[in-house]
From Swiss-Prot:
Family: Belongs to the LytR/CpsA/Psr (LCP) family.
Organism whose genome encodes this protein: Streptococcus mutans serotype c (strain ATCC 700610 / UA159)
UniProt keyword annotations, A-Z: Signal, Virulence
Lineage, opening ranks: Bacteria, Bacillati, Bacillota, Bacilli, Lactobacillales
Cellular location(s): Cell envelope
The name this protein goes by in its record: Biofilm regulatory protein A
Amino acid sequence: MKIGKKILIMLVTIFLTSLVALGVYATSIYNFSLGEFSKTFKDYGTGSGKDVIADEKPFSILLMGVDTGSSERTSKWEGNSDSMILVTVNPKTKKTTMTSLERDILVKLSGSKTNDQTGYDAKLNAAYAAGGAKMAIMTVQDMLDIKIDKYVQINMEGLVQLVDAVGGITVTNHFDFPISIEEHEPEFTASVEPGTHKINGEQALVYSRMRYDDPDGDYGRQKRQREVISKVLKKILALDSVSKYRKILSAVSKNMQTNIEISSSTIPKLLGYSDALKSIRTYQLKGEGTTIDGGSYQLVTSKELLKAQNRIKGQLGLKKSTAENLKTTASLYENFYGGDTSIYDSSSSASDYSSSGNYSGSSSDYGSSSSYGSNSSSGSSSDYSGQNSYNQGNYQQPAAGTGIGN
């Protein structure tokens, strides 16, 4: 199962909204909330070491959506991180940014010395498969040249349970055919018939994921995902039943892990970030498509990486990078192909999410491919020559059997 970036945003926004909503509940539900959120806590020791939330400072969060589709997996946290989003929250500027990280970016894996995959070049999403959340966090840190303060990882079952916990939502299928993804993902047999219907969690998942039969493709899917998040948030904010709120918290606690501590002492501090969460701007770090040893990868340009790093560092109050001192473990486009990349200028305008869950922007906000295009190499690293000699001496194929890079 592949989790979409927008669905991950939906789940995390619901999680953050639940945190902010804690302050309006009585002592009994408050104590229950603390108990449920305590189940989600797991610290990998990869953070900055500073208690940024207690100090009410800007902080960063790595959001990971975990692909748990295989029936052979024995843990809900075993698999790939098919979506990774770097979030910055600044209580002073009252701004939050979300930078989606393309899963196929070619990067050097960062991890402990005991992990034999450390130092290998692979797709970004392979970091989780090779070393769990810890390696994923360390790899993104080194790619973006920052320290990640917090992380949140969520599995797909969370969306299903959350929609069911709020009693379902009402949507309208404007197509003249049922919305279904069973042809491409046979494990999902639910569908949404044409017309207006109240749907459950399984149907909401299908409604949010279908794109192949949509004339607008991914843009149409994004539109439906925005519809789902706004309707779930509206129901959460209008809750008048303690039992329903308990179901929501239980769904979150079963399907999420984080090192954000939820306690009686941290909740007042977390509420101080509520204004920053009312306006969320989204971006995407995306590279240029190419083929290496038969595998599809994204190679980021120094221009786009510098732009992303400085936007993130600016939000966190850190010293910005320059073209001369750009630090990263990502494999840069220039190091493979050389040349002047100034003609490369994929769309990077931000999209806005309001506190009501509404969205403005167009599909072009998520970047577009340039004239370099995909499959610009001949499909084998042995064919690289001249300007590409840098790659020949540095590219390593991950160990066999790991599934990394596929």
